């Protein structure tokens, strides 16, 4: 089958960005969200999602004119329009009851040939389709994108034991050839593949950061390009993903895998999430967005290894706890200074 038109339900950070990527591929997309009772515009959330995508940095659209391919609407007035789409993807809140309620409504209006998908980052797919018809279950397959979806190549495709293998094949080909994704077919287990590994790494990094008195920036200096990983490293990745998402995934995985890896969140992280410090989506996480849209550390660092050729590379180990560095400490000796000659802790 060919996917000529799609619908994304949920116009939050991920939903709007996925809609933008579909538009980038030339696919008309219907973007729906709930109606806010205190807003006169019933499509307020969907419109806000498109506006956010237009302002996103890095850019969500290849060309802002592509936004014209996105039709905005709401779940009360426009749900019936799902009868015209070939693929429905949900990107709503990570609560199983909410997904059950949504799929019950979607099944009543979606056409019988449409593929149905969830972008859930951790809720097992087989739990989402409980109570749905055999035909719905046959066409249901998880599609887990990563933020920002225009730039991150990976797409996890997660079938259940009810999913038609032909649906998996057709959808995977669409994702690879039309959306330009690198597809990994994952088992329908808590956290799938990437989050089972990645969120565990973030949680363990938090635990070690507090244990050894490190800062987020110091941890990122250790766990980014120095290890052959992306420059976003650990905590910039967490900010991009959304700290609330990290919290949900870690809690969900930890709750169903008590005999496996430790997914216990630190109290300081829980306090951040409870206080609305959620990463890029709230403007502040482990890093804080500045007016020029560049993320700056929210926490000071003790000794910054250079990231340009004109600065000294500090020989003072970045893992040295701040408590061990007094204001009168001997300045670090640079390894290969070109212009700078010292690297003293602040």
UniProtKB/Swiss-Prot annotation:
Its EC number is 1.1.1.35. The keyword Nucleotidyltransferase does not apply. It comes from the Bacteria. Keywords: Fatty acid metabolism, Lipid metabolism, NAD, Oxidoreductase. Residues 322-346 are annotated as: Disordered. One of its GO terms (molecular function) is oxidoreductase activity. It catalyses: a (3S)-3-hydroxyacyl-CoA + NAD(+) = a 3-oxoacyl-CoA + NADH + H(+). Transmembrane segments: none annotated. On the 2D-gel the determined pI of this protein is: 6.00, its MW is: 83 kDa. PANTHER family: 3-HYDROXYACYL-COA DEHYDROGENASE FAMILY PROTEIN, 3-HYDROXYACYL-COA DEHYDROGENASE-RELATED. This is Probable 3-hydroxyacyl-CoA dehydrogenase.
């Amino acid at each position: 089958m060919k996917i000529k038109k799609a619908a994304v339900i949920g116009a939050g950070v991920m939903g709007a960005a996925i809609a933008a990527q579909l538009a980038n591929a030339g696919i008309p997309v219907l973007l729906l969200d709930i109606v806010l009772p205190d807003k006169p515009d019933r499509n307020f959330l969907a419109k806000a999602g498109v506006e956010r995508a237009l302002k996103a940095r890095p850019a969500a659209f290849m060309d802002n004119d592509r936004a014209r391919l996105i039709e905005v609407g709401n779940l009360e007035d426009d749900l019936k329009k799902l009868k015209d789409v070939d693929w429905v993807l949900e990107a709503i809140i990570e609560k199983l009851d909410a997904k059950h309620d949504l799929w019950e409504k979607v099944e009543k209006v979606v056409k019988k040939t449409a593929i149905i998908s969830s972008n859930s980052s951790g809720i097992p797919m087989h739990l989402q389709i409980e109570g749905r018809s055999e035909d719905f279950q046959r066409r249901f397959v998880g599609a887990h994108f990563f933020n920002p979806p225009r730039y991150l190549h990976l797409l996890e495709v997660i079938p259940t034991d009810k999913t038609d293998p032909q649906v998996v094949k057709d959808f995977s080909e669409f994702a690879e050839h039309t959306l330009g994704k690198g597809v990994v077919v994952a088992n329908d287990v808590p956290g799938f593949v990437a989050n089972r590994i990645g969120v565990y790494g973030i949680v363990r990094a938090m635990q070690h950061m507090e244990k050894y008195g490190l800062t987020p920036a110091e941890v990122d200096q250790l766990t980014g390009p120095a290890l052959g990983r992306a420059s976003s490293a650990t905590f910039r990745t967490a900010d991009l993903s959304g700290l609330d998402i990290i919290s949900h995934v870690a809690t969900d995985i930890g709750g169903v895998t008590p005999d496996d890896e430790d997914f216990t969140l630190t109290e300081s992280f829980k306090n951040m999430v409870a206080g609305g410090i959620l990463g890029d989506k709230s403007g502040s996480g482990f890093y804080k967005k500045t007016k020029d849209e560049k993320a700056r550390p929210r926490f000071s660092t003790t000794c910054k290894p250079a990231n340009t050729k004109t600065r000294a590379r500090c020989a003072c180990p970045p893992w040295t706890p701040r408590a061990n560095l007094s204001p009168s400490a001997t300045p670090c000796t640079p390894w290969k200074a070109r212009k700078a000659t010292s690297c003293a802790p602040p």
